[in-house]
Amino acid sequence: MSQILTTRQAEELHKSMVAYLSSLEASKSTAALREELVLPDTFDDATCKKYAGLLEKKFLTCSLKANPSKDNGLSALQILDLESKVAGLQAELSSLTLTSRSKGGQDPDNWLPGPASTRTFESHRDAITCIAFHPIFTSLASSSEDCTIKIWDWELGELERTLKGHIRAVTGLDFGGQKGNTLLASCSSDLTVKLWDPSKGYANIRTLSGHDHSVSAVRFLTSTENLLVSAGRDASIRIWDVSTGYCVKVLRSSDAWIRDISSSFDGKWLVAGGRDQAVTVWEVATAEQKSALLGHENYIECCVIAPPTSYEHLATLAGLKKPPAPSSSCEFIATGARDKTIRLWESRGRLIKTLVGHDNWVRDLVFHPNGKHLISVADDKTIRCWDLSQEGKLVKTIDNAHSHFVTCMRWGPSATTDVETTNGVTNKGTTKSKFQCVIATGSADSCVRVFS
């Protein structure tokens, strides 16, 4: 027995030696060494695989200690250690689900925001115009009429950085882009759309020019990697390829200011609403307008396409015998306007319900991921929760959510995974949602609040 190694260390070394020979497919040598070392019966082929590569790593570690790199001040051993830690963190991040990051003990499906915010962020010098959650990290972006964008850590309650580049009010934000390469898009009254790269310290990597007036809203097309949509006061909807910066399509139906846009979960449909009191429905592939929703009596401030989780409840409201298939997109739409109402529509143009309760302009809407609730904010300083399973009944009101108009709202990041059927085939139309119980609101009081 070696006097340097303990019994356990010697046994680990012997196992790694056998695993090394086994990986070389040297069966005779492996068998001979096994017999010579008298390894226990529990060291079977499956256990042997766990030791694969261990001997090489030990040799490399010793080699690096003897020959440190002097190129960048770090030894090669330190670099190896850092690479190992990075790999471990990446594995941990991959295994972390969105729901596991929510507070334990909550029932996400029935969660609604409470009367008190958990975080209040104050740094902007003018009204908040839009907010957006990073899809993976606990970063929250806010835009303001003070011409800046601020990035917050909404869990720690810290301001991470301030982005400057726009020269007039920043009016819209959205995170999106290729998987693993998330970008932040912003739009402004300075007629531009800007792209910021979080992986490069939120460097402004591209500016998209083409609008002839203030840009009001910007959205990444869901389920596409490179397409971004913007709309504005020049009455146009522009679709951009963010990888090239080129405008690939321009949609236009009237001369009215477009205030908001929304895309379907599969990126095939767009809806837009604005000053002409109409909501238009567009097919992205053909750039054709498919329908117009008419009924509001003042400017439309917000529009959102209903998720498939809401189809069951909205189909009942619409008097349908059965809900549309979950794989279909843009079946129902919710809109909010300066006429103080929220309207629920079939995408073909039929009004199915008008929700009345706000005392001022309705500024933003978001569907609860469970599909059962619709949440709204307005210039009456309230957050209101509507139960679609009870014919759109108002079930909760948070008064004085802010000290001034509540201008915008977003739900925290959600993820959906395809559900496998019993025969193992993936059903693209049936998804399982994982989401966090958190929403953020912005206000004309220059504050951002987080409810979680």
From Swiss-Prot:
So which domain of life are we looking at? Eukaryota
UniProt entry keywords in alphabetical sequence: Cell cycle, Cell division, Coiled coil, Cytoplasm, Cytoskeleton, Microtubule, Mitosis, Repeat, Transport, WD repeat
Fetch the Pfam families from UniProt. Answer: LisH_PAC1 (PF24951), WD40 (PF00400)
GO molecular-function annotation terms?
A: dynein complex binding
Q: How does it assemble?
A: Self-associates. Interacts with nudE and dynein.
Family as reported in the entry's similarity comment: Belongs to the WD repeat LIS1/nudF family.
Name the UniProt record assigns to this protein: Nuclear distribution protein nudF 2
